[in-house]
Amino acid sequence: KAYLGILGLTGITAYLGLDKIGKPKKGETLLVSGAAGAVGSVAGQIGKIKGCRVVGIAGSEEKIDRIQEKFGFDAAINYKTTDDMQKAIAEACPDGVDVYFDNVGGEILDAALANMNKYGRVINCGAISLYNKSEKPTGPRVETTLIKNSILMQGFTVRDFVKDFGPAQKQLAAWMEKDKLSYLETVVEGFESIPQAFIDLFDGKNKGKMIVVV
């Protein structure tokens, strides 16, 4: 099962997103949205291995506790109980944000950009907050922010780095052997469970990787 999750595309996505775009350095602050999810939880743990201060964004108190207690995040924000995300990020990241691993897009991305440091890096890995929108949402224009702070914001599709899958998987396995990485999975049985499992992903009901056994 690990090869369907942390040693598969899930872990490889987190690893290569940080390695190729985020390039976190010791002492920097890494912010991760969708932090309790399969990719986000691994990204946060890799950030800790790299010596970063890691802050996660998730959507329930249970998830907030999980990413701090199980995955070692330094701080966490529950976006569902936060009225002002920009302020919440500023408080959780008093030294600003150097790397933002974005799995959700939308208003949370806007709030993160407002807290980015000079030469910050944004990894646009997902936009789950927008996938079910019938109309394209509007938001702040980001050009001035990107220019003023020399921020790199890059869309990321793991398929662009197929040649790097082997080395990434090898490094992830080495960290697992040293107990530096943990993971969770939600396993449901039966082909007929696939539609509900897919819906549960968008409702955030899964813990880590969603796996359907048929």
Residue spans for each PLM region:
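Terminal helix/beta-alpha structural elements that buttress the NAD(P)+-binding lobe
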Residues: K1-V214
